[in-house]
Amino acid sequence: MTISRFYRILLALCGLVGVSIQIHDDGWGMLLYYTVLSNILVFSSLIFFIIYDFKKGDATTNTKLLRYKGGVTMAILITGVIYHILLAPITEPEKFWTLRNFLVHYIVPWGLVLDTLIFDAKKAFRLREPLYWSLFPLSYFAFAL
């Protein structure tokens, strides 16, 4: 097993555990939150990439998959950055220092960024793709209003 596969399996498990704890503790209504949706997007995408790796070869060289992963990375990075800047300072300490909080707001977002920077092929993106990647966050923003 390659290091990238092992890393993605660990990261997918972190996302799955974090989302599972949130849903267990706070109910199915958590599925309406951007944090949970973006973490589900991450772990389901990572599971797909892992299966792709086993069946067809290295997913990190497939430019279509990397472009999709760029969008997933942008979506989860928004989760991490917005939480850290806007919400973490006002979160009560007993809610901040929990496993689920660190999994969904820090470990999975920054873990996927590291995965992208370390394992993915370089220069796989086109200049206009960040515009496409912003569709998921903007759609959620419209939904939230």
Where do the protein language model's features map onto the residues?
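Aromatic-rich, lipid-facing transmembrane alpha helices and their immediate juxtamembrane interface loops
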Residues: 1-145
